[in-house]
Amino acid sequence: MSEKINANQDNDRQITLVDDQGNEELFEILFTFTSEDYGKSYVLLYPAAVSDDDDVEVQAFSYDADEDGDVTSSDLHEISDDDEWNMVQGVLNTFLSDDRLSGE
């Protein structure tokens, strides 16, 4: 398995998601990575309005980068394959357990 993780070094990387009811919520980009096994890029997001004491629910999507290589909400795709989801979860677990990547 080969993935390249791009940790979010810029605190201003945000994206707005709109739910089925039309409610907008601002998210911070935790990090992006590319999987050679799946031939896709992925983005992991968390709500911008979370305090340090709150449990954070991270959301993951595959995405198609825009012409600048950036992520926009119109480029996001839900992950529906269980094996693909397990791979993404494994990358997230690695990120969270590695102080050099997570910035802790």
Swiss-Prot record:
Disulfide bonds: none annotated. Coiled coil: none annotated. HAMAP family: UPF0473 (MF_01448). It comes from Lactobacillus gasseri (strain ATCC 33323 / DSM 20243 / BCRC 14619 / CIP 102991 / JCM 1131 / KCTC 3163 / NCIMB 11718 / NCTC 13722 / AM63). It comes from the Bacteria. PANTHER family: UPF0473 PROTEIN CBO2561/CLC_2432, UPF0473 PROTEIN CBO2561_CLC_2432. InterPro entries: EF_Hand_1_Ca_BS, UPF0473. This is UPF0473 protein LGAS_0424. Belongs to the UPF0473 family.
